[in-house]
Amino acid sequence: MRSHSITRSTAETDIEVSVQLDGTGRYDNQTGVGFFDHMLDQLARHSLIDLSVRAKGDLHVDDHHTVEDTGIALGQALAGALGDKRGIVRYGSCLLPMDDALVRCALDLSARPYLIWNVDMPTAKIGTFDTELVREFFTALATHGGITLHIDLLHGINSHHIAEATFKSVARALRQAVETDPRKSDAIPSTKGAL
């Protein structure tokens, strides 16, 4: 079973994340940030990665530490579940529409973290959620998951739709990348022999 759990405790947050790569997209996410929970649910459902997040953060300050630290812990959990990455497809991409929004994601589970972010949100908030935190989450996820991650907004006028299409696009790309390659199930997907 390709699964992993992470517990991360700082002066700002206490976070527990569990992932099961060969799941069905089950989720149980409780961060105290409603919109963010909704996005994490989308990430699980569309990647088919079972995901459980328990986060307690300094929400009296703002949502930033909770969202960013969840990204850190989730990245670490994904990296742990992937292990040496033997047999995975490694790459994934998705062009995902949601009403007015069209988001493209391409990723490589390369152990070389990098984020290219071409997403402009038209509003500063979605309800009470700061839209700039979407980028903070994916920066943390890519950095601590060892993911080369390109996300581009091609069209969009509604911030909620843009954010949701972004999470769903990344989820669908992850779904492809973490799959076991039936033709190379015993091989590291690199000519270097390691990732």
UniProtKB/Swiss-Prot annotation:
Any one GO MF annotation of this record: imidazoleglycerol-phosphate dehydratase activity
UniProt xrefs under NCBIfam families: PRK00951.1-5, PRK00951.2-1, PRK00951.2-4
EC number: 4.2.1.19
Gene Ontology biological-process annotations: L-histidine biosynthetic process
Top-tier EC class: lyase
Family under the similarity heading: Belongs to the imidazoleglycerol-phosphate dehydratase family.
Source organism of the structure: Roseobacter denitrificans (strain ATCC 33942 / OCh 114) (Erythrobacter sp. (strain OCh 114))
Predominant location category: cytoplasm
Keywords: Amino-acid biosynthesis, Cytoplasm, Histidine biosynthesis, Lyase
Disulfide bridge positions per record: none
Catalyzed reactions per annotation: D-erythro-1-(imidazol-4-yl)glycerol 3-phosphate = 3-(imidazol-4-yl)-2-oxopropyl phosphate + H2O
Identification of the protein by name: Imidazoleglycerol-phosphate dehydratase
PROSITE patterns assigned: IGP_DEHYDRATASE_1 (PS00954), IGP_DEHYDRATASE_2 (PS00955)
InterPro entries, per the entry: IGPD_sf (IPR038494), ImidazoleglycerolP_deHydtase (IPR000807), ImidazoleglycerP_deHydtase_CS (IPR020565), Ribosomal_Su5_D2-typ_SF (IPR020568)
